[in-house]
Design a protein with these regions (language model features):
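Bacterial Sec-dependent N-terminal signal peptides
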Residues: 1-24
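N-terminal, motif-rich segments that launch catalysis or mediate targeting to/interaction with membranes
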Residues: 19-126, 133, 138-263
Length: 263
């Protein structure tokens, strides 16, 4: 189904800690987003950014490293209530900051170039982040705050091996790091081949619906992955399909949102 070759899963376990999708994943999503922008939107985006979406996609990660902007760390996370609904109005939540940034872009004539730049950078990053399942928190489900499980290589005896895997890094970097031998452009094209038939379906809705949709994926994933569980490699790999789907949704939805804003 996919043209990407199968890489040894254990190699991806050496992944660096990430704060959301790692840079490679962000760049891949951004490339796929750019592939789905109409010409008018491309020109409007370039006029504001003075560069490409791909080159600006991790700006918010850089911003949070500034001690004076440490409060923005919470913007990378998205809270759902116990019913899986996005109802929060907390200024520290990612969905609220995303909605504020969208409002600026929809009312550009009343905002400075600097404000538009900050807003566009924020939209680019947070639409992507809300599709990283480890950044969705659900009230009453403690596991969504993070946990560690173990992966088993499905061998017994002397060949048996197990290693720790964090919930955060599984979605942030483990799967995408399996494809870093390719460029973000190539990876984006591969995802598009897999997902393009679902583009119209994936592009529907608005940001709060997207977070709720992700919350449903989180609940399903936690049925197989939980604190202290020993999980066979092949079971973990079944979640790679969902990771790819999340990246596709992020790109198609971001493109649809920007095309609508700049129509």
């Amino acid at each position: 189904m996919k043209k990407i070759v199968f890489l040894m899963f254990a190699l991806a376990m050496v992944a660096n800690e990430a704060f959301a999708f790692n840079t490679f994943a962000h760049q891949t999503i951004s490339k796929l987003t750019e592939m789905n922008l109409n010409e008018k939107t491309k020109q409007e985006v370039k006029a504001i950014l003075k560069t490409s979406i791909t080159k600006e996609c991790v700006w918010l990660n850089t911003l949070r490293k500034n001690p004076e902007m440490a409060h923005t760390k919470s913007w990378h996370f998205f809270q759902l209530d116990a019913n899986g609904k996005s109802t929060t109005m907390d200024e520290n939540d990612g969905i609220v900051q995303l909605e504020k940034a969208i409002a600026v872009l929809r009312n550009r004539k009343n905002h400075s170039e600097a404000e538009q730049l900050t807003a566009l950078r924020t939209v680019i990053h947070l639409v992507q982040d809300l599709h990283c399942l480890s950044h969705i928190r659900i009230e009453g489900i403690e596991a969504t705050k993070g946990f560690t499980f173990r992966i088993w290589n499905e061998l017994d005896g002397k060949g048996r091996k197990e290693w720790n895997q964090k919930w955060y890094t599984l979605w942030e970097s483990t799967f995408s790091n399996r494809y870093t031998i390719f460029t973000p452009q190539y990876y984006a094209e591969d995802i598009d081949i897999y997902a393009r038939d679902k583009k119209a379906e994936y592009s529907k809705g608005e940001p709060r619906f997207w977070v709720e949709n992700g919350g449903e994926d989180v609940v399903r994933a936690l049925k197989l992955l939980n604190t202290g569980a020993v999980v066979p490699t092949q079971v973990v790999l079944t979640h790679e399909f969902n990771h790819t789907k999340c990246m596709a949704k992020a790109a198609y939805r971001l493109a649809a949102l920007l095309n609508d804003i700049f129509k």
